[in-house]
Each structure stands twice: as C-alpha cells, then as structure tokens.
Amino acid sequence: FFFTVSLSVQSANAGNITINLGHGNTEGSAYDPLAKKFAELAEKYSNGSLKVKVRCCAQLVKEDEAFKAMQLGTVDMAIITGNNLSPHFGLTDAFVLPYIFQNKEHAYKVLEGPVGDSYKKKLLDATGITILAFGFVGDRDFYNSRKPIKSMADMKGLKVRVPKNQVMIDTFKEFGAAPIALPWADTPTALQTGT
C-alpha cells in the first residue's frame, strides 16, 4: 500500500488542525492499526496541535476514488494500494507487476531506497501528492464461492475480483481467469451474489 497525504502549506501552519485519514478496509483490518498508530504519533509529536481522525470502511471515499479526492482537496490523507494509485500516475504500475519483488524484504529495500525516493519525488512533482510511507499488508490470496484453487488450471474461466488496474486485469486474463474490475468495498456483496 501507499500511505499518501495532501495537505496545503497554509493548513499545516495554521496551528491546531484536525485532518481526516481514510481507508477502505474495515475497522481492525490491516490498514486500521497503521492509521490509528499514525494518529497517535501525529498528536504526540505535534504536542497535541495535530489531531487525526481515522475513517475506516470507505466513510470518506472509496479507495479507488481517494487519490483524486486528495488532489481536489476533499480528502486530507488516505491509505491506497498501488493498484488504485496507478490510474492517476502510471509509473506506479512498475510496482504492481506480479512477482516484481522476491519477498517483503526485497520490496522494502527497493521502495525505501533510491528507487522509492525517485518515485516519490516524481509523484509529488506530477500530482501534488506526497507518499509518507510504503507498506505491505499481505500476500495476494484467492477466494471464491465456486471451487478450491489448487493449480493454475483451476483459474480457467473463474470470475475473479481485481482492482480497476490494467496490469491486474491483464495478469488474471493470462492466468486463465475472467477478471472483473470491482472496488474492494463491493467484494463481499459480489461473493454473496456470485457476480
């Protein structure tokens, strides 16, 4: 994921401020402890002058709309996956490619080094959005309501929810699946209805 922020210099110098930090996952999910820890540390290190309200469950905006909302100034901060950032900044697809990283340690080494620094600068220059941190929330798992997936052959024709990201859509087509671009927040309903 990408922990992103869009704050104007004016608001950052305005004294006591409250900002909203949104994410699309449920309370208690992988994003939530990160967001709550950030809120705690922001208040601590600002001596209480900065309050961060964590808004889970896409209360502010769906994750695939969060980046644009930050650019428009309607959302202060968001935790966004690379899949949902890349439509707004295509270079992000380099990090969305499957198997581009050997493991978490390799990903952090690349993203927290010169490559990540260069990417963050290019993103800021092009969009006005700052990345505060890169993170990892888990491996990509496959869940479906049809059958167990034990081999690539089991993917053939299987409807699979993917983000609205062309790299992911193309990847799952190559796996033999029938990818359906769908926001994460809509996935539980889609699984229940079989869509």
Predicted regions and their residues:
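Bacterial N-terminal signal peptides
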Residues: 1-6
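Immediate post-signal peptide segment of exported/extracytoplasmic ligand-binding proteins
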Residues: 9-23, 40-51, 125, 148-159, ...
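Extracytoplasmic "Venus flytrap"
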Residues: 20-36, 57-62
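Short, polar/charged alpha-helical segment
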Residues: 28-53, 167-170
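Extracytoplasmic small-molecule ligand-binding "clamshell" domains
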Residues: 37, 44-45, 51-71, 76, ...
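Contiguous mixed-secondary-structure segments that line small-molecule binding/active-site clefts
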Residues: 39-43, 71, 76, 81-180
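Short helix-initiation/N-cap motifs at beta->coil->alpha
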Residues: 55-68, 164-167, 180-193
